[in-house]
């Protein structure tokens, strides 16, 4: 898969284009084909114009990048490697809000194919990926981890 990514025969997707996801997507896009996915259409439109909504990156960060910004879930079907970089805010009691990673898991479950890879970059507590995210992905995709996706 690594060589196919470098040869641009396969595509990587980054889910969540905030202050963590966008720089990751842009850095990968300097070498491989990338889909940058965010649920916020206004943010996606800004990034298509080379503007970082968080104002952390300048327009030069978008130059010479092979990236397609989208909020269309169907575009994600072109990817074979997914990186989840959605926020995981905590409340006043330091309890994490898992809704963003759960929704990202639902999104991936709708497009995941046999042999695809999923990486969670989002900061979550130990066991969260296995206990909360993987079951959602498996239920929606109909695939089983390690047998049909990793």
Q: Language-model segments: which ranges?
A:
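Serine/threonine-rich low-complexity intrinsically disordered regions
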Residues: 1-2, 52, 113, 129
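Conserved N-terminal Rossmann-fold NAD(P) cofactor-binding segment
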Residues: 2-11, 33-35, 39-81, 87-95, ...
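Glycine-rich Rossmann-fold phosphate-binding loop(s) that bind the pyrophosphate
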Residues: 17
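N-terminal Rossmann-fold NAD(P) dinucleotide-binding loop
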Residues: 21-22
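Aromatic pocket-lining residues of Rossmann-like dinucleotide-binding sites
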Residues: 27-28
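Rossmann-like NAD(P)(H) cofactor-binding subdomain of soluble oxidoreductases
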Residues: 90-148
């Amino acid at each position: 898969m690594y060589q196919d990514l470098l040869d641009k025969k396969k595509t990587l997707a980054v889910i969540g284009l905030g202050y963590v996801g966008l720089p990751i997507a842009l850095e990968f896009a300097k070498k491989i084909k990338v889909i940058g996915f965010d649920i916020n259409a206004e943010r996606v439109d800004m990034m298509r114009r080379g503007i970082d909504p968080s104002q952390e990156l300048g327009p030069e960060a978008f130059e010479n990048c092979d990236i397609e910004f989208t909020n269309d879930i169907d575009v994600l079907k072109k990817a074979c490697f997914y990186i989840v970089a959605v926020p995981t805010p905590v409340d006043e009691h330091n309890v994490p809000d898992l809704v963003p990673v759960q929704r990202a898991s639902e999104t991936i479950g709708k497009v995941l194919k046999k042999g695809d890879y999923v990486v969670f970059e989002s900061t979550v507590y130990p066991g969260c990926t296995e206990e909360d995210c993987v079951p959602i992905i498996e239920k929606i995709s109909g695939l089983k981890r390690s047998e049909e996706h990793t």
